[in-house]
Amino acid sequence: MGLLNHKIQKFPLVLLSPLISLFYVGQIVLISNFFTGSDNIAVYIISLLPITANFYIEKNKFKFEKIGIILLRVLTIIIIGFSSNTITFHQDAASYHLNTQLFIRTEKVVLGLANVYVRYGYSSLSDYIGSIFWNDNNFIYLHFLNLVFISIFYIFLIWGLLESSSFRLKMMSLGVLFFGILDNFGIEGGRNGYIDIDTIGKQDNAFAILFFLTNFFIIEKLYKREKLKKVDFFIILFLILFSVEYRFFGLVSLIGLSLLIKDNIKDYIQLSIIPFLSLGLIWV
């Protein structure tokens, strides 16, 4: 639990705990799929253990003067949750996502699925995570997974705007929010670059948010010319691996990370080569 009290660029890591939990779930399902389908009681129990971390609050961190910000976060999540009322399936859900998840649920890893249907090769970690959130014929929990990323995105912007002491970050958060408002009145009704709430079976925005957070932390470190702490290195590397497992394009973030660690690259590589390289190779 001590790690959750850490701050990277003054941003409380505890606010990213839902992402950490989903990353853990994805890795457990991915590894276990070499031996069994994910529709297995043992996989469920092991995968859902970290959810308890999301209810952890260190008492001395809670301050009543911040109750307004806490309520704003809760209100943001509630408003986003209203999307569940009218959400529909994306065409990719029927095309390959749900079928891929069904294979993950019922079978051990099936090699060469892309030879059967090329779009099976487009699956990502989202399908491994989503495979344990089926509820009979109701797929609303898959939509909730998308809402986790959207909620984290807005919680991050609220932090930058109202809690950060940096004028630059306040302006960045305000600029992103202002762009989102303007995009609602763009060509053909907007959605010309800003994130939106994905329909069920799509995870483009999940990757976009992971990529945004990853490169925010990297750029902030580069801007301040700060030495990268080992724990911050692991957090950034975790975000990079998570984004790569959603979209291979996430590897671009390694360029910025390499600039951060260029002076002590051997030390950092020795720290990361076993856990992250192992998970990366399993994913490939």
Question: Where are each of the predicted segments found?
Answer:
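Membrane-interface transmembrane helices that cradle and orient dolichyl/undecaprenyl
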Residues: A206, F211-V231
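Hydrophobic transmembrane alpha-helices of multi-pass, membrane-embedded glycosylation machinery
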Residues: L49-T52, T214-N215, I240, L251-D263
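Membrane-embedded glycan-lipid processing machinery
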Residues: Y141-V148, L182-A206
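Perimembrane helix-loop-helix junctions
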Residues: N60-F64, L251-L277
